[in-house]
Amino acid sequence: MRKVCRVTINDQVFSAFRGDLLLEAAHREGVDIPHDCNSGDCGMCRIRVLDGLAIGGEGRRPGTVLACETRIMSDLDLRIDTLPRVQTVSGEISAIRRRGCDVVEVKIEPTDPLMYLPGQFLRVQFRGYPSRCYNPTVPMDDEFPELDDLHLQVRQWDGGRVSPTIGSEIRVGHKVRMKGPFGSAFLRPRSESRLVLVCASTGFAPVWSIAVAAVRENPDREIVLVAGARSLKSLYMVNALCMLARFPKVTIVPVVETPQRVPDVIRVGGVTDHIPQLSAQDSVHVCGPLALVTAVTHIAAEAGAPCYCVPFQSRSGEREALEGGQARAVGRAPEWRGGGQQRARAS
């Protein structure tokens, strides 16, 4: 007979057999662990191991495992973050705005409230099209004054089934269904550590949401934001970066990959070439292409810094299935709503 193990998750206790998958054992006993993909891609079932032995499914951060892939090998004491509940909400597009040569911002009015944490993502389906994953974010200027609506930054991929049709077939009034939130790369509240944010292209969407929430919670928190783009015309988030730059403890590092004549404040080269020296006291968030996420994760690990990441690409490599932020500074701070849960409110 297999050994019976005692498993504690926060304040819930249940029994499981040695060798059981943690996620399956928990759900069998009526203990809820937030999850989505069941394949280790989304990171939503990441859980901290305080005591005991669990094998497999090691998370990117030391001391964490993915419940869908790890097996119980002894008594366990585990902790999991309290997250907004996953729900399905309908809505419709109320505005579309061109943000750059290949980026559009989509404003969605939900029919019911939708709570999420800055940095989480949603599965979004425009009626008649396949679903895609996007990070809800906050507006970058005053063109979209209703901050309780959902805002998506979408890169339009040549040959894509969904993104190229936004603004033509997918227009204002188009019906939308959203499920979420998912993901564990969200801003941890009440932290005093330096916040290092790294992104490329529409990876800026979750990073912008995190940055706004962080400065609203603590305007004196030290933040470094490194934002990359292929060229100057692709650096669509310049106005938002200028908003953040007004805060004295915020350092903005815009980077373009292609060598060209640019203003002195913009760096040229790879994004990782301009990441500040990290330490174990930093908190790092990265969103962008898989190569960038992998590189930043490695740099953070060498420094002993926690790194929360959202690659654009899943392990299957289906680029457009994750074509949003997931794959995946002149400001008026008093108007920003961040810190803790964001709420998309019914109109």
Region roles according to the model:
Residues 21, 28, 44, 121, ...:
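Residue-level marker of beta-strand positions
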Residues 147, 158-347:
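FNR/FR-type flavoprotein reductase catalytic core
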Residues 6, 78-80, 122-127, 174-180:
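Short conserved beta-strand and strand-loop elements enriched in small hydrophobics
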Residues 15, 36, 115, 168-171, ...:
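Residue-level "contact hotspot" at macromolecular interaction interfaces
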Residues 7-8, 14, 24-34, 43-85:
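Iron-sulfur (Fe-S) cluster-binding segments and ferredoxin-like electron-carrier domains
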Residues 50, 81-83, 127, 157, ...:
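Short, surface-exposed secondary-structure boundary micro-motifs
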Residues 88-175, 193, 229-231, 255-259:
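Ferredoxin-reductase
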